[in-house]
Regions:
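Nucleotidyltransferase catalytic core that binds NTPs
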Residues: 1-163
Length: 163
């Protein structure tokens, strides 16, 4: 069984998260997409409590048997996706993965990039994507929901909520 890890805070899950997961299911192809929530995500301060985020994802998974959820204490994508066949992310997260400032050294950064499985990246507005950054192990997902964001949903934008 081929499984894709889709790391994120999903605070809350949006129509964009769901569209990216569905695109990964078909494009990669995989048998299952696992939403992987970090207990302490990089670059996110005070996310909604984990049990509330898990409850929202459980409701989302109810009629999607190919969608699962996992929780991790890892923070770096290379650690989160270890053991998976594919790692799925938006262009904004991909830009973060390619930023060496999130690592203790350039050597650590290069080692982390080398550990990544196949990477599936979804466009996100005008955020540039470097599809050749890992020498051909990056594929682009045919989905772009532009400005859809969890921040906007938390601020009251209900039509972007996945539930």
């Amino acid at each position: 069984m081929r499984v894709a890890a889709y790391p994120g805070t999903f605070d809350p899950p949006t129509i964009a998260h769901l569209a990216v997961a569905e695109a990964a299911l078909v494009t990669c192809p995989v048998d299952r997409v696992e939403l992987v929530l970090s207990r302490d995500p990089i670059g996110k301060s005070a996310p909604t409590p984990l049990h509330e985020r898990l409850g929202a994802i459980d409701a989302l998974r109810a009629d999607r048997p190919w969608l699962s959820v996992a929780v991790t204490d890892h923070r770096l994508i290379a650690d989160v996706c270890e053991g998976y066949d594919v790692v799925v992310m938006g262009a904004d997260k991909w830009a973060q993965v390619l930023d060496p400032s999130y690592h203790e050294s350039e050597t650590h950064w290069h080692a982390s990039l080398a550990r990544l499985p196949l990477v599936a990246v979804a466009r996100r507005g005008d955020v540039p994507i470097e599809p050749h950054a890992l020498g051909g192990t990056v594929i682009l997902l045919d989905v772009d929901l532009g400005e859809v964001s969890s921040s906007a949903v938390r601020a009251g934008r209900t039509d972007w909520r996945a539930l």
